[in-house]
Amino acid sequence: MNSNRAAAGPVEENVGTQASVGPCGFVYLYPGDTFPVEEASLLGNLHAGGEVFSLPLLSGLTVEADFHVNVKAVHKKLDPATVSVKASAYHREVIVFANAACFKPIFAGPGLEGLCAASRQLFGYAEFEERAGGAARPFELADLGHLLPGAESHIAGVVVTESFKERLYRGQLVVVESQIQSVRVGECDAFKVPLYDGELFAKSPCRENLRYFYHAGVSRYLFEAHYTSLAQALRVRDVPGLIGALERQSFHDQYKLPKVYECREFPATGHRGAGDCSLTIVDSVATELAVSYGLSFLEVPQEGTALLSYDKWPIFEGCETPEQRVEALTQFNAKQAVHVHSQLFSGNSVLYLARVQKQASNRGGGGENVYNSFFMGHGLACLAEPTQKENGLPSFPGVPASALSGSNYSLHHLAYAASFSPQMLARHCYYLQFAQHQKSSNNSGYNVPTYVGTAANTPMCELCRGSCPASCVNTLFYRLRDRFPPVVASVRRDPYVVTGVAGAYNDLDIAGNFANYRDKDEESNQSEEREKFTYWQVTQTVLERLSEAGICEGGEDVGDAIHNIGSFLKVFKEIDGIVDGEVARFINSMVKNNVNYRESIKSIHHIVQYVCNVYWQPPCPVFLNLYYRCVLAVVQDICLPTCMMYEQENPAVGVSPGEWLKMHYQTLWTNFKNSCIDKGVLTGTEYKVVHKDQFCDFFDVDSAARGEFVSCKTQVRISRALMMAPRVMKIKNRIIFSNSPGTESIQNAFVRGTPKGDSCVVSGPYMRFLSTYHSQLFPGAKISPLFLWHTFSKKRQLPVFPNVPRESVTELANYVEQNSRLHGETSIIDVVPENFYTYAKVRLNNALFRACGQTQFYATTIHCLTPKIQTVPAEEYPHALGARGVADVGEYLGAARELTVPTVQCTSRDNICEVGKCRPIVTLPLVVNKYTGVTGNSQIFQCANLGYFIGRGVDKNLIPDAGSFKKQGVSTSMRKRHVFMTPLSDHLLRRSVQGAAVAFEIEGVRRRVQQILSDGDNPHVIRDVVLQLVKSLGSECRSVSEYDLEYYMGQYYIFAGDVSERLQRLSDLGGDWSEEWALSVLGEEEDPLGGELEFEKVEDAECLGHPQQDEFALAPQAAAPQYSGSSSVAGKKRKANVILGDLDL
């Protein structure tokens, strides 16, 4: 499939081609009196005392409804009639630079600027330097006074394309005031002024009249919040040098040239041998390829999404007042905060990736795959180590040990995670306020009210000087410090945690992508003779049949399904019958389609699709930076084996990385292009951006420089036509334990142990239901369900219930014990069913695994951790008091006693399949494994596998359990994978309900009728069809025509006459058209067996008649004489006997 797509060439019909010619950015002006500042404040990252911050790019909040997210940005004039354009997407942020005081800070704690500046200097990262005064006066809002009176009072923000952020940073974009236009943004009338690159006016004689947009606050924000984060991902401390390299790449199309090697630093322990030299080269090439490919991935045109429509967010439905809208935004911010928590509290966060490392060689030989020898290493301890330039000269002396708290996480590390930006740090702290603290057992002196009333309100605090101890970041850090990871340098190849948004299609059921036939269908366009019965169809059919039986409704239990012991047994026996029947049909379908299911089951996976579209990311600057970091980390991880193999063929001993790159980088760039996309992890498409119109509308440049607008026609030339656009990143989780060499150490976590006989019921699949329906099963019972069934398991004794028949109790106990014991002996799914549908799925998948021969090892299961809001008293959450002062502990407790705060915690009880369909925000650990293809294929492929979180403070659900009724003593965390999920559907997205997805009632009737007809062993099949029609249609059966029966019965329409005859008989008799009435009428007539018919085998019965000889006339020369007498034969002779008549064989 990939080769066919590559042979077809780049796609010309794409979002880049469809983009219109336009400017490089806009300056937006919003009226301060009608702009929703309270709502916008909850979406921004303004810190206390800040003057510049960002808001997300959202139509209805910051841009107009018809804003186009892609543009062919004009940046140069090639000749008087031709302009050069660059196709690009707009940056997801609107940087507000005027009248920021109208907004409320997202975090009230002061001193963030000083903390970030001190941390930046401590870790050796370059500081922002404001541009010296240029020749031209920079643009100011007052310059628009003749066009827009009172422009200085407007809230102003700047929007820029991804390809021209560096030009905005350097103040090289020109404000074309003559093209100001009015737009409707939400409920306010705003204005926007286009920004064009200064190179467009390079030959204009009126250049002195131009107003270049340069705002030191905007440039500082880009430097700290965006470029420093990129520098951390690329292991570069020289941020200005990196910005210059990115400008050369984007503006001058230097994608195939090395650019960043002059800015790079390396550990001071390097350059001592061939191994260290190889590591330095691989590290350098990984950075260069990440800049050339990773950053180009981030600037290509992308498809717009429904997430950008702020005025259509479902969370605002039912909100009648501004306060309710603010509360709705707060609730959603709390839910997405768990993803920021997991990144900050995980020791293997993508924010803490510090260097490229090489695994030590295995002494025993035959170690790990050589392609995985280089890996992305994490560990905050690496930040404190000294570094040097490629020529060996010292660059960074390291962090003094006295400046940090040993191996303890500090505020400086939190500032590093926020890229030393006070705006980003404020947003991080806002999310941390929703986190619940976990007190360490070694921290006996931990007491939040005492800390606020004694230590935090003194001038010793360097940030707030005791003026606002409740909202100070030191107080927040004290409350949560036990959850932060230790500061250590890892030497293992551990996964790293990524955050983004999942795609619409994920294989997250228990058996994952088993029997989906997707790959086979993509490779072959041949139509199948038989309809394939996929695994998804099986689970869907089971759910539908449970719904028809009145047991489930959309995966949720029906409340009145169980009301006594009889109904309890009926429900579970009905579930067992439905599941066992569907499993048998599914297995038979695979046999008919020649599916080798016993082998294919060994390679099934859960699959999560990470969407590589920036407009699918949550509208928050923290998540935007996390998306950039994740893409760059994965691109570097993918390229490591390519760099390693090329360096081995072209060793760099005695040559500096810069000189080596100048000789080999273009070859590496070309090689990586073929090994980056569609090799297992990243899927993407190569765009060819074209402009189909020969001329387009533009304006006269010289007139614009004079402040006039004169329309003209111009030709367009694309500066960079070919673009590689990533689509999704596939993360897989292997379900069946491989038991391959090298996995012996983790085998104990997967091998199935023998369950103890005295705990099979308590740890079995029915205990959840026995506890939930305890009062219905045993009315008036005072004994707890746990004690009742634990006593029964150990002593086989049951109490006497006066209101319950003894026979019913005995039947229930025998059923539960027998099936619990059978489940414990055969189940390889370590999941406790939460509802009837989960019970059915566990039983179904256990049957499938058993049919495929998988009984020895537990299957790996995947669970989602979804956020739940909990309102708690504010006594231990001091930020509820805001920026007010506190004199002592008593005053603090008195002020906090009447307050409550929303907090967030996670639950693992939600159905991951249903959550996965809701476009969730996902946070998960992954490790990229590399391997080669079949013998003779030298291509390197990759696979992103689901990993594990490092750190006990990530979430309490991830702490290894030590339950009383564990099936075995080893940890189950190795076979249980977890993913943090926050659904966007019903929050920021409306559920897409297509017309074809909503079934008509007649479709359900047709399906149920044909299920009955497909059962060839049912002697009452016609009667059951009539009963089903009466049950579904009622009195409408009187008007059922032959055409209706043709639809309902499908291929079984040949029996429609029998069904029509019985319906007519019922119609003639008349009645209430209930199922009981129809059964009473038809039950007496339908008794075909009657105990009188006897069946015998065909070969044992005497053949009473044969075809006439002329029906099988033989050629005259081949005719043979006939003899009397017949002979009974079997097998192949039977056919010949029928054809040749009485011929004696």
UniProtKB/Swiss-Prot annotation:
Its main location: host cell. One of its GO terms (cellular component) is host cell nucleus. Residues 1115-1145 are annotated as: Required for nuclear localization. Keywords: DNA replication, DNA-binding, Host nucleus. Coiled coil: none annotated. Transmembrane segments: none annotated. Belongs to the herpesviridae major DNA-binding protein family. HAMAP family: HSV_DNBI (MF_04007). This is Major DNA-binding protein. It comes from Equine herpesvirus 2 (strain 86/87) (EHV-2). The lineage of its organism: Viruses, Duplodnaviria, Heunggongvirae, Peploviricota, Herviviricetes.
